[in-house]
Structures are given as C-alpha cells and as structure tokens.
C-alpha cells in the first residue's frame, strides 16, 4: 500500500486524467476496503498530507476520481434533471419557433397545434412583441372530471427598424405567422461628450 501512496505523491504536479484512471484501477481494491485513501469531490487533482516529508509513514492521500468511475454516476443525469422537464407535450418549451430575416420584413413562425385564434393574443408594447396562448378545457362527465390547462408565453425584443404600426399575424393549420415589416431607420448623429 505504501508504494501506491508514494506513487500518488510523486504524481502530484504531473498528473492528468488518464493517469488518474490508471492509478484508480491499480488501487481500487484498497479504496473499496476504505483503508487509507479518502475520496473527495473537488478539483480533479491529487494532493497528499505531509508532501514535504516523504519518509513519513502515515500519509493520507486525497483523490477525486473521474465521474465515469463513480458508482451510480449514470443516475446523476436523471436525478439532477428529474423535475426540470414537464411531462406535457404542450409545454412552452415544446413550441417550436423560427425567425426569418428578409429584405423588407421579418417573419416569426410559431408552431402552436391545438390552439385557435381566440386562444392566442399578440400584442406590441415598448419595442417588445408579446405572444400568449391559453387553453382551458373542463370535460365533466359522469365517468370523470377531466380538466386541461395549457399555455405559452413569448416575449420578443423588436429591432429598431420594425414598423410597429403594421405588424400582422395569421394562424393556419396550427402555424402562427407574424409578419414584422421593416422601415428605413435614419442613423442618429453621435453626440460628443467633452472630457473634463
């Protein structure tokens, strides 16, 4: 075991990930028995107590092994992201968008299946375009009390050259198309600020 500890201390400043993997494979039986090597999280480097005294008989090495060598690390992704994803197919993240730039206009396309014109609102205010959709269905019957609610909200910052008075929108076959006409914007003169 002391040869492995001395090997760890000799590699303190010259270690890389590949060497850590090889070293871990050499000493993993000792790690599993928990004799002298302590696993910690932190930076992927190796450090040891009393490095300046190599003849010291009681050395403790700290080793962080790569994540792919940790037991149960395959579950980290699923456990970390368990509550971040919504199960609804109609969540706001499920709505696909596309922004098209043309010479005389911008076109914003949103895929909003299942929404009709009365359930979608498009508003413009202070160089921002607000697009909201809301569906509430109450399907009461003798067999069940089903209630469905789904919505989305998008806010788009408009460029300076968008003619906000002539924006138009169209909904057809679950595709919302918003046309943003462009106007010529005169470049403002720069104002020089004197340095005092």
From Swiss-Prot:
It comes from the Bacteria. One of its GO terms (biological process) is response to heat. Keywords: Plasmid, Stress response. Residues 88-196 form the sHSP domain. Coiled coil: none annotated. The keyword Plastid does not apply. InterPro entries: A-crystallin/Hsp20_dom, HSP20-like_chaperone, HSP21-like. The keyword Cytoplasm does not apply. Belongs to the small heat shock protein (HSP20) family. PANTHER family: 26.5 KDA HEAT SHOCK PROTEIN, MITOCHONDRIAL (PTHR46733), HEAT SHOCK PROTEIN 21, CHLOROPLASTIC (PTHR46733:SF4). This is Small heat shock protein C3. It comes from Rickettsia felis (strain ATCC VR-1525 / URRWXCal2) (Rickettsia azadi). The lineage of its organism: Bacteria, Pseudomonadati, Pseudomonadota, Alphaproteobacteria, Rickettsiales. The gene is hspc3-1.
């Amino acid at each position: 075991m002391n040869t492995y500890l001395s090997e760890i201390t000799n590699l303190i400043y010259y270690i890389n990930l590949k060497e850590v993997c090889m070293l871990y494979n050499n000493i993993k039986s000792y790690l599993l028995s928990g004799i002298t090597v302590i696993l910690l999280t932190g930076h992927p480097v190796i450090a040891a107590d009393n490095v300046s005294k190599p003849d010291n008989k009681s050395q403790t090495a700290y080793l962080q092994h790569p994540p792919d060598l940790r037991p149960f690390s395959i579950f980290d992704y699923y456990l970390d992201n368990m509550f971040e994803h919504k199960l609804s197919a109609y969540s706001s993240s499920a709505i696909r968008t596309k922004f098209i730039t043309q010479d005389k206009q911008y076109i914003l396309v949103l895929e909003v299946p299942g929404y009709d014109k009365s359930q979608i609102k498009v508003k413009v205010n202070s160089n921002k375009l607000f697009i909201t959709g809301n569906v509430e269905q109450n399907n009461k019957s003798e067999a069940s009390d089903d209630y469905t609610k789904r919505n989305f909200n998008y806010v788009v910052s408009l460029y300076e050259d968008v003619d906000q008075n002539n924006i138009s929108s169209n909904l057809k076959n679950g595709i919302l198309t918003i046309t943003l006409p462009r106007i010529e914007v005169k470049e403002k003169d720069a104002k020089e600020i004197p340095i005092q």
